[in-house]
Amino acid sequence: MISGSSERHIIDLSQGDYEGLDQYNAAKPFCKKAYRVDRAEDMGLAVARAIRTAVSGRPGGVYLDIPADTIVQEDTADQSNFGVYKLVDPAPKQVPNDEAISRAVDLIKNAQKPLIILGKGAAYDQTEKQVQQLVAETNIPFLPMSMAKGLIPDDSPHSAAAARSLSLRNADVVIVIGARLNWMLSYGDAPQFNPHAKFV
């Protein structure tokens, strides 16, 4: 979110300008990160930093505050061009080590009743082809969370959506792709899940 605000000296001294809420500090508790731009030449860096923060790690909202005295600053064309940043790999991938991959493969190979849970992270990352291939090659049933519906067609013979509770209770290995074990999935705990289930 990009927003204008009152001039810095008015905000900092709490002088009570018209609609002069300290938006930067007000936004901090409600977003992943808040930034304030104090100089026009820093605008490009601030926008690049905000985008990288928003999409890196766990995605989240970022607030970018541009005070009125920054908005009216003048800049030369050279300064403006210098402040433009090209985002290179805004969300670097996190790659697990070989040992972790090997353990996961062994768990999945030895599973009697594996289950794949697809979450919104899989949808955001546009993994349709990869998850469809995974399900087709392994014949592991899948359960899409609401924001992941459509990654694999609902009429797939591998869909466990119609037997959600039974699938969760019986699965001995649960492969979680792009989802979090939060309240919607009972934090991965029994009785909704098999108490001996292993999670990948």
Question: Residue locations for each model-derived region?
Answer:
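N-terminal alpha/beta PP-like core and its mobile active-site loop of ThDP/TPP-dependent enzymes
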Residues: 1-200
